[in-house]
Amino acid sequence: MSLIPATILTGFLGSGKTTLLKRVLTEAHGQKIAVIENEFGEENIDNDILVADTNEQIIQMSNGCICCTIREDLRATLQDLAQKKRKGELNFDRVVIETTGLADPGPVAQTFFMDDEIAESFLLDSILTLVDAKHAASQLNDRQEARRQVGFADQIFISKADLVSKDELDALTHRLRHMNPRAPQKVVHFGEVGLSEVFDLRGFNLNAKLDIDPEFLKEDEHDHAHHDHVHGEQCDHPSHAHDPASGAGHHHHHDDDVKSFVFRSDRAFDPAKLEDFLGAIVNIYGPRMLRYKGVLNMSGTDRKVIFQGVHQLMGSDLGPKWADGEAKTSKMVFIGIDLPKDIFLQGLEQSLV
């Protein structure tokens, strides 16, 4: 049985996840989609909206977050789905996990790599993050979960853009790009997106494609001075999170704790040195490293080495050969929470041949 693709749909409370999901479920695409819903709270309100006119099977896990309390439940649900599909009791092509607005997508993503049984049945395709343009400024300022959701994204959809001015939208896209230069951004109205922008994005594939927003690279040339704010690491879950409905103003560059930086070099890496260094930083900073990916020039091979990771989980693979005349430039992007950029860049520099 080929692996079942899974998509994690995340985004802050009220950002339009259910609207997007409903569109995906009702569109005539001929795919059978199993949805795992996990809204925060005793009652699941989305149920009434979703079940109205779709015949998809919706598996609900109410009563807590995937990220902390019921991680076990997500694994059990995925195992149950895979088993039923194998036995022919259920027929579906892919899985969408809609996380609660308070969830950190990290542990959800890790489930697909850490659990052998899950990894034998499912392939994590991508993490999609919805951002509510109207309330993004206050949510990103006040909630680390919102910043993490942006940091983890393979694709960012911006909703409610019609409720803010062009300047406010520009400020938001600029801010999101600084937090995550890997994820393309798209403005969506009422969940209207093409399926090709939702499925089969291969965000977790170890492939040679490392998309970094070219605008980000331009800005990266001159570094911004940062004064860091310290935010707690705990995943705290108030039973109700009320966000002040403040507009998305602020044109200055926000000093978010979720930041990204890029390392580039035309010199080859020494494989042993690089392995030692990456092992050490993942050991120390793993919990704060949200996503990282690179296309590397390693001494001793004429092929590109593709590497990527989530928190402490890291993998690498041989990619295609460097083309004739192609500049053998290593490029790595790190997205994380207050990572010590200087230590990373210096250590990578020292791992070169």
Regions found by a protein language model. Name each.
Residues 2-139:
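Nucleotide-state-sensitive switch-loop elements of NTP-binding domains
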Residues 9, 36, 132, 159-160, ...:
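A secondary-structure boundary/capping signal
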Residues 34-36, 91-96, 122-131, 150-162, ...:
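Conserved beta-strand/loop subsegment of P-loop NTPase cores
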Residues 87, 119, 145-148, 253:
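Structural motif
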Residues 107-117, 134-143, 150, 158, ...:
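Non-catalytic interfacial helical region
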Residues 155, 164-323, 327, 337-353:
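C-terminal accessory "lid"/substrate-recognition subdomains
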